[in-house]
């Protein structure tokens, strides 16, 4: 569908909600995506994200913090399950699969208040990129973390 000059392309995601989706928006030869509540990712997700210029990408939890944290066991299993949320590590691996020279902004978002914190998400994703099978290193990517309490800076692509 379109909103003014913006083409909005919803794509199906794996999450325990009714018809969950991510979004890719295109205008003037540029594209941005919102990819949260992923649960898991696969080639279908990669295909929808692979050449975006900016992305809001879920980095919901640190696996160890979730495992030892206050959530009841069934909730921990749901969060870590295929219809839950992406861990910091999986977010970094997904980022490795979609990195390209024209990706100008990666904003990590949807961080769990109980099972993550901004610095840990940032460093874990950066490390996954550095160790990943791609030509980029963590310091070379335009990575930031969205604040839970304040709006982020405006990003131009």
Residue ranges and their predicted role:
Residues 1-54, 154-157:
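Core dinuclear metal-dependent hydrolase active-site scaffold
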Residues 12-14, 58, 147-149:
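Residues at the C-termini of beta-strands that transition into short coil/loop
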Residues 29, 61, 149:
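A broadly conserved detector of short glycine/acidic/proline-rich loop/turn motifs that flank catalytic sites
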Residues 37, 111, 148:
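Cofactor-binding loop segments of dinucleotide-utilizing enzymes, especially the Rossmann-like FAD-
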Residues 43-145:
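Cap/insert and terminal regions of metallo-dependent hydrolase folds
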Residues 141-157:
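Short, basic/aromatic-enriched C-terminal tail that caps enzymatic domains
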């Amino acid at each position: 569908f379109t909103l003014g000059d913006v083409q909005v392309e919803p794509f199906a995601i794996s999450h325990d909600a009714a018809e969950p989706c991510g979004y890719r928006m295109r205008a003037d030869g540029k594209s941005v995506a919102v990819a949260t509540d992923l649960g898991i990712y696969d080639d279908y997700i990669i295909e929808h994200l692979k050449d975006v210029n900016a992305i809001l990408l879920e980095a919901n939890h640190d696996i160890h913090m979730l495992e030892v944290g206050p959530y009841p066991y069934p909730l921990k299993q749901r969060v870590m399950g295929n219809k839950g949320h992406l861990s910091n590590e999986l977010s970094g691996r997904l980022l490795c699969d979609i990195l390209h020279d024209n990706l100008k902004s990666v904003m990590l978002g949807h961080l769990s208040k109980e099972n993550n914190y901004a610095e840990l998400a940032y460093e874990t994703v950066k490390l996954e990129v550095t160790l990943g099978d791609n030509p980029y290193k963590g310091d070379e990517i335009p990575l930031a973390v969205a604040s839970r309490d304040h709006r982020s800076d405006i990003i131009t692509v």
